[in-house]
Amino acid sequence: MNYTLSTVSSATMYNSSSNITTIATTIISTILSTISTNQNNVTTPSTYENTTTISNYTTAYNTTYYSDDYDDYEVSIVDIPHCDDGVDTTSFGLITLYSTIFFLGLFGNIIVLTVLRKYKIKTIQDMFLLNLTLSDLIFVLVFPFNLYDSIAKQWSLGDCLCKFKAMFYFVGFYNSMSFITLMSIDRYLAVVHPVKSMPIRTKRYGIVLSMVVWIVSTIESFPIMLFYETKKVYGITYCHVFYNDNAKIWKLFINFEINIFGMIIPLTILLYCYYKILNTLKTSQTKNKKAIKMVFLIVICSVLFLLPFSVTVFVSSLYLLNVFSGCMALRFVNLAVHVAEIVSLCHCFINPLIYAFCSREFTKKLLRLRTTSSAGSISIG
């Protein structure tokens, strides 16, 4: 299977682009309305109750918490007593949203894996697509934890699973950006340097690069995993990141690591690759308009779903540095990070649409697989 830029028909790309744009707009509108409703319904409690998920990058270190045995531990950087974050993660709307994204992501990525296994991995692009799909499934694994946390209204799965929850999210985040970048570099080489790049655009190189990405992503995710733990606050156990005063430098390091390695470097490479691709296509005798549409679709969707998370994490770093402060600012930052996190998780089911279902070749194989399955003679492997 070769997911080249030329395998997509103009009509298919137009319809796919419109459908994906519509889906993305609907998802973001739903998220914003759900979170906005929760924000309006929140009342300031007399005692602080933390209702954050993995997205809470500020609350845990802007408040002084006290444990049940009255051994208090100070984790404040800015003294804002009883400043609630204004994000209710236990609402029915948010639970429904998590469930929907989970099933869509699971279903879409399993279909991609099934097709890849049936028709084998033949090219470096197939290898990157396989690993991108596995990365999205890692993202999908975060949702059962978030659902449990929202329904149970506290964490009772222990420290180990708490850390793995954080690890799943950030390995999935770094992997997704890395494999999107590698796929873009491969498209760049195929279009701009088609002959010179043939010796390195092989399945073997794809395997090596994929292993490197998984190792590097795990290393990049390790620091924040160390700070994720379970703590009891006012009788309720929470699983999220806790920083004490001495760990402020680590918080800033992790925030800038997310921005530099998770967005700035990949986005710079993406923009360069697609700029060169578009220039090459425009000056070539066979002006491949289908490929240009595919290029814009990839860039727009990548930025739409992943850039907001990095931007809001950067804003939370500014809060840490006291560029701005106060309860209202804290609530805004937490809400922004929370929405951006959910938007980033949505790409786990959008990616199969972009990199697979927009490909005429993939669609043919999927239909062939469905026909074979209906006949009862399908063999996966």
From Swiss-Prot:
GO CC annotations, alphabetized: host cell plasma membrane; membrane
Membrane topology, Cytoplasmic segments: 113-126, 187-206, 273-294, 358-381
Transmembrane portions of the chain: 92-112, 127-147, 166-186, 207-227, 252-272, 295-315, 337-357
Glycosylation sites: 2, 15, 19, 41, 50, 56, 62
SUPFAM superfamilies (UniProt xref): Family A G protein-coupled receptor-like
Extracellular compartment residues: 1-91, 148-165, 228-251, 316-336
Subcellular location: Host cell membrane
A Pfam family hit: 7tm_1
PROSITE patterns, sorted: G_PROTEIN_RECEP_F1_2
Family indicated by similarity: Belongs to the G-protein coupled receptor 1 family.
Record-given protein name: G-protein coupled receptor homolog Q2/3L
Annotated organism of origin: Sheeppox virus (strain KS-1)
